[in-house]
């Protein structure tokens, strides 16, 4: 798609989103705009800290959220209507939107980063896997699995580091590259007792661009001192969690040859739509609570 086609597509998308916006306003609900299916994470938080009386717009991308905002701001009939917007931080500069008080930017790369902390994993282990840390018979197993999770996560971050470095540099140099076709299995092999790289050269993963054009030291400087749990690509981090949970379930169900579980256990666990079903366990940043609460008096 060339630049003209892209602009035409974005314009059409904004037009559709604007019609949805008008419909929400007409029904006296609060319009809320998202990049995509982020409602799966945000819904409970919006209902808890702001209102249940809202309608949402899936704008299909960060730039389209901001384009819709601009369109609303230019419209004399709607510019004073309350509407709030949610976008991911990504590897973007974001300096042009930090001062927009009606736009919430995640404090991490994306909402998916809010699902992978040790604290979230502990809740999943307890509530979904039924391994109770307060039960004397299960507390040792709980601690063992948590320790293994931390070890695998550390290995995963080490393996995924190079990929994140280059994705950051590609973004910095404003190359329009899509990573949707890159599966987690293209990057890492996730086992219950180890995480290793799937590739021998990063150029085999990022095939469409000459990586020799980039100065890796710039990425090293950017990521220095940052927590990969928060600053690495959220989708990759989230897929790591998904895969490891599957590996744990498989280990628990084995008749013999188990590596983590001392005896066979039946664990009722679904891999369907974890972003939505595990939203209740995900972190809720204080800045999100503050953002939502600040609009309560305006309704």
Regions found by a protein language model. Name each.
Residues 1-299:
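Acidic, divalent-metal-binding catalytic cores of TOPRIM
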């Amino acid at each position: 798609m060339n630049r003209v086609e892209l602009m035409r597509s974005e314009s059409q998308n904004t037009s559709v989103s604007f019609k949805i916006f008008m419909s929400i306003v007409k029904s006296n609900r609060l319009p809320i705009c998202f990049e995509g299916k982020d409602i799966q994470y945000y819904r409970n938080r919006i209902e808890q800290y702001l209102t249940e009386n809202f309608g949402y717009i899936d704008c299909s991308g960060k730039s389209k959220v901001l384009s819709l905002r601009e369109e609303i701001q230019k419209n004399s009939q709607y510019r004073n209507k309350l509407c709030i917007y949610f976008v991911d931080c990504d590897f973007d500069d974001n300096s042009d939107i930090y001062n927009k008080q009606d736009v919430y930017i995640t404090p991490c790369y994306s909402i998916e980063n809010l699902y992978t902390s040790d604290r979230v994993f502990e809740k999943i282990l307890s509530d979904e896997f039924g391994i109770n840390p307060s039960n004397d018979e299960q507390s040792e197993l709980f601690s063992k699995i948590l320790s293994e999770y931390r070890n695998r996560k550390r290995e995963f971050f080490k393996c995924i580091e190079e990929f994140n470095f280059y994705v950051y540099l590609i973004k910095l140099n404003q190359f329009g590259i899509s990573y949707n076709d890159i599966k987690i299995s293209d990057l890492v092999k996730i086992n219950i007792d180890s995480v290793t790289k799937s590739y021998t050269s990063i150029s085999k993963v990022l095939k469409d661009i000459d990586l020799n054009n980039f100065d890796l030291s710039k990425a090293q400087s950017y990521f220095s001192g940052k927590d990969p749990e928060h600053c690495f690509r959220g989708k990759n981090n989230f897929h790591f969690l998904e895969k490891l949970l599957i590996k744990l379930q498989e280990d628990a169900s084995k008749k013999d040859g188990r590596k983590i579980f001392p005896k066979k256990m039946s664990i009722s666990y679904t891999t369907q739509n974890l972003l939505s079903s595990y939203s209740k366990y995900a972190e809720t940043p204080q800045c999100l609570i503050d953002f939502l609460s600040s609009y309560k008096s305006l309704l």
